Amino acid sequence: MANKGFFIITDISGYTEYLTESELDHAHEILQSLFDAQLKHIKFPLKISGFRGDAIFMYTPELCFVNPQTFLETLENLYIVFLETLRQMQFNTTCPCRACRNINKLDLKMCIHYGEYIVQKLGDREELLGADVIVPHRMLKNHVIEQTGVKAYALFSETAAGTLRLSELSQPLIPHTEFYEHLGEVKMQVFDLAPVWENAQERKRNFVSKEDAWVSLEKDLPH
C-alpha cells in the first residue's frame, strides 16, 4: 500500500570541484565533518533513507508529520549547523593546503518534494520506491543560481510548497520552473537560506555567554 510523505535531499554545493582541486586526506576530513554535523541534527520526524555521494536523502511519512512551521525550522536548523561547522573550520585552521583554503567554496542546498512512495525491504535495509521519490533527485540539477542569483537555498516543488502552505509561513519565495526528461515541467519555489543564517548570527550577537567571549572584563565597584 502506498504511503504519502515529504522527501528531502541535502546536497553539498561545490562538492565535485572542491574534491578534484583539493588534497584528498584533508578534503575527506572536512567533508566528513560537514556530514556528521548534519547527521547529529537529523531527528524525528525526519528519517534517513540513504546517501548519494555528496547528499543525504531523508523522508518524513505523512503520519509522522508534526506541522509546517516545525518542518521548516528543522530544515533551517540543518543549514545553520552546516554553516556553523564550515565557518568554525575556516576560523580554526592554519593549514595552507588547498582543501583548507577552499572550504569557503562549499555550501548547502536542499530539494524537497511531496508525494507517494512504497517501502521495499532489501535485506536489512529499506528503500523507497515511486515516481515521486525520483523528483527531488532530479531537482538537484537546476538553474536556480543562474536565474535567481541565490546560492544557498531550499528548493520546494510546487506540490511540497502548497502542502506546507509556505506562502503563509516564510519570507517571500521565488517562483522557478525546470523541465526534466520523463517528468516534463516541474514548478518550484526557491527559499533563500542566506537570511536564515544572517538572522541566526544576529540572535547570537545579541547574547554572548562568558564561556563564548574572547575577552571578558570584571571589576569590583566601590560599595
Please place each PLM-identified region on the residue numbering.
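A generic fold-level signal
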Residues: 1-2, 51, 103-105, 128, ...
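Context-gated lysine
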Residues: 4, 40-43, 47, 105, ...
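Intrinsically disordered, glycine/charged-rich C-terminal tails and inter-domain linkers
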Residues: 145, 149-223
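Catalytic beta-strand-to-alpha-helix segment of the class III nucleotidyl cyclase homology domain
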Residues: 64-175
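Catalytic NTP-binding/metal-coordinating core of nucleotidyl cyclase/transferase enzymes
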Residues: 1-77
